[in-house]
Amino acid sequence: MRIADYSVTKAVLERHGFTFKKSFGQNFLTDTNILQKIVDTAEIDDQVNVIEIGPGIGALTEFLAERAAQVMAFEIDHRLVPILADTLRDFDNVTVVNEDILKVDLAQHIQNFKNPNLPIKVVANLPYYITTPILMHLIESGIPFCEFVVMMQKEVADRISAQPNTKAYGSLSIAVQYYMTAKVAFIVPRTVFVPAPNVDSAILKMVRRPEPAVAVEDENFFFKVSKASFTHRRKTLWNNLTGYFGKTEEVKDKLTKALDQAGLSPSVRGEALSLAEFAGLADALKGQGL
């Protein structure tokens, strides 16, 4: 019997008198086939260390620990720590850290892996309410995670993996795809969770690029420009950029020159631009002193 088997999950929760906290976005997966697919998608073996976020009662952790060199699981809810000590007692390669992943010194914790030089993959069922902050925090942390295989709200997975000229494409797509390739591996129906969420989930696989997708002069400025370009989706690039940089004649003149240099029409919308075109635009705007 697996931790994720519904009868086992129910028994564990009852034995420990556990009640779900909405503020932590807790939804426990009770489908062993899906858990197996997640671990297979992540290609976990004994030459990989794994960071897990939000292990819950250890359903996914169990599958990870059977194959990984080590698993370090970060759980914010202190009530789950004794439950995890119970459900994962047979594994000596799992460390549970009762910390908020957004506040912890991750670089320091990673040194506690027995072999910190092994590749590190992030595999997690992320809480919906904080998916994007956690992802961007990890991607921008400077820690060389080679891969992320994470469960999230399907809508967010679609936005992250979206391509230009689609409804889902936006600044989040650009922010992630600058660093990683991103592809939806498979869909997870809401019916396999306890309690069931209101929407379906998706497993998103992200692999770190050896180098960023495009070369830019100033990364922070590149992200600011891409974000500004999607402020109002139905507005043109010109309207969004004048809204961000200002509408003085001097600014308009610089914007006109930058757009011309980047080979872009003022009437185009942000959703039509590729990463390379955003890179060219950002560098041209920077060159104009904006």
UniProtKB/Swiss-Prot annotation:
One of its GO terms (cellular component) is cytosol. InterPro entries: KsgA/Erm (IPR001737), rRNA_Ade_diMease-like_C (IPR023165), rRNA_Ade_Mease_Trfase_CS (IPR020596), rRNA_Ade_methylase_Trfase_N (IPR020598), rRNA_adenine_dimethylase (IPR011530), SAM-dependent_MTases_sf (IPR029063). Belongs to the class I-like SAM-binding methyltransferase superfamily. rRNA adenine N(6)-methyltransferase family. RsmA subfamily. Keywords: Cytoplasm, Methyltransferase, RNA-binding, rRNA processing, S-adenosyl-L-methionine, Transferase. The keyword tRNA processing does not apply. This is Ribosomal RNA small subunit methyltransferase A. CDD domains: AdoMet_MTases. Its EC number is 2.1.1.182. S-adenosyl-L-methionine binds at N27, L29, G54, E75, D100, N125. It catalyses: adenosine(1518)/adenosine(1519) in 16S rRNA + 4 S-adenosyl-L-methionine = N(6)-dimethyladenosine(1518)/N(6)-dimethyladenosine(1519) in 16S rRNA + 4 S-adenosyl-L-homocysteine + 4 H(+). The keyword S-adenosyl-L-methionine applies. It is found in: Cytoplasm. One of its GO terms (molecular function) is RNA binding. NCBIfam families: ksgA. It holds the Pfam family RrnaAD. Its main location: cytoplasm. Specifically dimethylates two adjacent adenosines (A1518 and A1519) in the loop of a conserved hairpin near the 3'-end of 16S rRNA in the 30S particle. May play a critical role in biogenesis of 30S subunits. The lineage of its organism: Bacteria, Bacillati, Bacillota, Bacilli, Lactobacillales. PROSITE patterns: RRNA_A_DIMETH, SAM_RNA_A_N6_MT.
